[in-house]
From Swiss-Prot:
Organism ancestry: Eukaryota, Metazoa, Chordata, Craniata, Vertebrata
InterPro entries attached to this UniProt entry: Se_SelK/SelG
Organism, as annotated: Xenopus tropicalis (Western clawed frog)
The keyword Calcium is annotated on this UniProt entry: yes
Matches recorded under PANTHER family: SELENOPROTEIN K (PTHR16875:SF0)
Function: Required for Ca(2+) flux in immune cells and plays a role in T-cell proliferation and in T-cell and neutrophil migration. Involved in endoplasmic reticulum-associated degradation (ERAD) of soluble glycosylated proteins. Required for cell surface expression of CD36 and involved in macrophage uptake of low-density lipoprotein and in foam cell formation. Required for palmitoylation.
Name of the protein: Selenoprotein K
Keyword Protein transport on entry: no
Annotated region described as Disordered, given as residue ranges: 48-95
Record key words, sorted: Calcium, Calcium transport, Cell membrane, Endoplasmic reticulum, Ion transport, Membrane, Selenocysteine, Transmembrane, Transmembrane helix, Transport
Highest taxon of the lineage: Eukaryota
Residue spans crossing the bilayer: 20-42
Pfam family, one: SelK_SelG
A GO-annotated cellular component: endoplasmic reticulum membrane
Originating gene: selenok
Gene Ontology biological-process annotations: calcium ion transport; protein palmitoylation
Amino acid sequence: MVYIANGQVLDGQSRSPWRLSFLTDMFWGITDFIVMFFQSIIHPNVTRRGCQNSSSRTRFDDGRGPPGNPRRRMGRIDHNSGPNAPPMSGGGUGR
């Protein structure tokens, strides 16, 4: 990848992939993953905002609030009219 450093255009291929900053970033990334993995097993109801008990958490904790009214009127379900259900396929006798 091409990048600019100190006003010069440099090619990314000249940098070593095993430089110290890459190794330290990789180490801390793996360490954070392992710590978060075991924390999620030990305390599964901990979120970024802290511990969330099921009793203290409401349905609309994300700040959006309850949904509004439907935009159009829904039709009434009428069980007395309409076509009959199709017959079951396969028949009987284990076929």
